Regions:
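Extended, non-catalytic structural segments that build the interaction scaffolds
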Residues: 6-7, 117-125, 322-342, 437-453, ...
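Catalytic alpha/beta core of large soluble enzyme barrels
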Residues: 80, 233-239, 243-245, 264-360, ...
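Active-site cores of enzymes that catalyze phosphoryl transfer or operate on phosphate-rich substrates
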Residues: 295-301, 305, 409-413, 540, ...
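A glycine-biased structural micro-motif
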Residues: 297-298, 371-382
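Phosphate/diphosphate-binding loops
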Residues: 380-402
Length: 635
């Protein structure tokens, strides 16, 4: 292939443009693959799928540069290097964009508009900037097959994802549970642990020391919380059975000025851990007695917000023992609101505390919580809750507490921890296998695998994969209304063979069409009908299936897939350690008991002028076209 010469002075832009034109005319990319077929020496690459409902940024150029360099190098060594493009087309990023366009800012508004119409808009939205991606890809000289991409919204891709979930179901790795999950009221959906890991922010907000008045004593137990909005849902206090506690009496006002609201009367008695007296108390105190936490267990106290929770026929407002109580901070006493924390929920189920919500799915206090709180967004009520506690003499003191708190990775709103039903992949059951598989991957830099991914996997949690949304791969699980039998469908053929006679054949594998399909119960002794669980999959599960779903495996291309799995090389930014890198590894471990990729290159982030990561959601992305024809972007 003759290389064109630049006339006169070197013009890099003209040279690049002429080379691209020549590659297109001679179909050089295709020939680089076909001319090496007979050598039967493949080098396999998996493209991380971007979403085409947003313009490409400079960070996409950088990642594609590293992908292209390695693939060209392997081509020059004589390998067959096929590069299939991919599109990630489901999930919240798409829904949120369409909601903004249509001014549908709640689930109720979406359902009033119509799920079918909304999902059609989502389907159209994902291709908004496809041409911009094509032009950027061609202009930078990135070789990838964009004419035959894998697309996560295609029925073939969805069917392969269904098949993988059925493998997990049959192995006992897919289960329905009621757990406390990070939840975003603005998007109306829960999140998995690896999604939450991408959205922590440092915040400064009020924390409070609260007085819980014992029923059999004049003393009050002090507890500390950084989430005042959970206090109306309090139903229990947890102490460490072997921790030493003190009962103290207030003898004088504080010697230093008092910061914030709260206080205590002279002669008032308080109970807290001995080791934390100096950290918590501001008044002068006299220690009346010391005793182990076990002496507090079983004692009852008065509710903070009478009537907010129905405590009849339960063990509500009781002190219990718990092994997670420490004296590292707080008062050595943990306030327990069953529905709003993982430890709280587990303890509540064990001790028989009432499991009742004081907060709705919209993030607002439900009617009957308190007249000054009902119907209001919880994070806006902290100050009013503190006022109410001070008015009733239940506030010892408040202070500002700075800590990292999870925020929605798409809306940037703070998440709430909320007890809810969800479908989980039991990653804890394959913990040792996924750690082993991670050690088999060649990571660059090495610490990405040994530290960042390794430490993450050492604390792996069950993966909450169901989302209470509309646009996504439907969870293929049906449950019998009559006997409760559960069935996971693994193919379109299986669904059609089991559907009731009056159920329609869905025109595509999306909501609301699959919602209309009812199945005959798989229990031979039951004549009931099975209804699909109204969830879609975590879109990270979608992309985690890319290694096999791109080939519609196992329904087609079995030999093709088996010849390229696991892939030789993937490359994305380092934040994908707990995103795509993890989901690929999690799915391949649970389905194939194997790695999904042999080598992984993780790249650092491109930062803006303020040192923050560039992202579409922040609006700080640099447009590649502002630089392509001005300078050598590769430099």
């Amino acid at each position: 292939m003759p290389v064109p010469k630049a006339a006169g002075n070197l013009d890099p832009v003209a040279l690049e443009t002429s080379l691209i034109e020549l590659w297109n005319e001679e179909n050089t990319f295709l020939h680089s693959i076909e001319n090496r077929r007979e050598r039967d020496s493949p080098f396999t690459f998996l493209e991380g799928p971007p979403t085409a409902n947003g313009k490409p940024g400079i960070h996409h150029v950088i990642s594609r540069l590293y992908k292209d360099m390695v693939c060209r190098w392997k081509t020059m060594e004589g390998h067959v290097v096929e590069r299939k493009a991919g599109w990630d087309t489901h999930g919240l990023p798409v829904e949120i964009e369409v909601q903004k366009q249509l001014d549908l800012m709640s689930n109720e508004a979406i359902e009033a508009f119509g799920m079918e119409a909304f999902n059609q808009k989502c389907k159209e939205s994902v291709w908004t900037y496809e041409q911009a991606w094509r032009e950027m890809t061609e202009r930078m000289g990135f070789w990838v097959d964009m004419d035959d991409p894998y697309v996560t919204l295609h029925d073939n891709y969805i069917e392969s994802a269904w098949w993988s979930l059925k493998q997990m179901f049959d192995k006992g790795l897919l289960f329905r549970g009621h757990k406390v999950l990070p939840y975003c009221p603005q998007t109306g959906t829960s999140y998995s642990s690896h999604e939450v890991a991408q959205g922590y922010k440092e915040v400064s907000e009020p924390a409070v020391f609260i007085k819980f008045k014992l029923k059999d004593s004049i003393a009050s137990i002090l507890a500390w919380t950084t989430t005042p909005w959970t206090l109306p849902g309090n139903v229990g206090l947890a102490v460490g059975p072997e921790v030493t506690y003190c009962r103290v009496k207030v003898t004088a006002e504080p010697s230093s000025s008092w910061e914030g609201r709260g206080g205590a009367e002279i002669g008032e008695e308080l109970i807290l851990a001995k080791d934390l007296l100096g950290n918590v108390l501001r008044h002068k105190m006299e220690v009346l007695e010391e005793f182990p936490g076990s002496d507090l267990i079983g004692r009852n106290y008065e509710p903070l917000f009478p009537g907010a929770v129905d405590g009849s026929n339960s063990n509500a407002w009781t002190v219990v023992g718990a092994d997670f109580v420490t004296t590292s901070d707080g008062t050595g006493v943990v306030h327990t609101a069953v529905m709003y924390g993982e430890d709280d929920y587990n303890l509540g189920m064990k001790e028989g505390f009432p499991a009742q919500h004081t907060v709705g799915m919209d993030g607002k206090f439900i009617e009957g919580t308190h007249e000054k709180l009902d119907g209001r967004y919880v994070k806006e009520c902290d100050s009013d809750i503190i006022d109410l506690l001070e008015t009733t003499g239940k506030l010892y003191r408040e202070h500002i507490y700075t800590h990292d708190y999870p925020h929605c990775w798409r809306t940037d709103h703070p998440l709430l921890y909320y007890a809810m039903d969800s479908w989980f992949v039991k990653m804890t059951a394959v913990k040792e296998r996924i750690i082993q598989h991670n050690s088999e991957v060649e990571w660059a830099p090495e610490w990405t695998g040994t530290k960042r991914m390794g430490e993450w996997l050492s604390n792996v949690k069950d993966w909450a994969i169901s989302r209470e949304r509309y646009w996504g791969t439907p969870i293929p699980v049906w449950i019998c209304e009559k006997c409760g039998s559960e069935h996971c469908v693994g193919s379109v053929e299986e669904m059609i063979s089991m559907k009731t006679d009056d159920s329609p054949t869905p025109p595509e594998l999306h909501r609301p069409y699959v919602d209309d399909v009812k199945l005959n119960c798989n229990n031979d002794n039951c004549s009931g009908e099975m209804i699909r669980e109204p969830y879609v999959m975590d879109c990270w599960f979608d992309s985690g299936c890319a290694s096999f779903a791109q080939w519609h495996y196992p329904f087609e291309n079995k030999e093709k897939f088996e010849g390229v799995f696991p892939v030789d090389y993937i490359c994305e930014a380092v934040d994908q350690t707990r995103g795509w890198f993890y989901s690929l590894l999690a799915v391949s471990t649970t389905v194939f008991d194997n790695v999904a990729y042999k080598r992984c290159l993780s790249l650092g982030h491109i930062l803006d002028k303020d040192g923050k990561k560039m992202s579409k959601s922040r609006g700080n992305v640099v447009n590649p076209w502002d630089h392509f024809n001005l300078s050598l972007i590769h430099i």
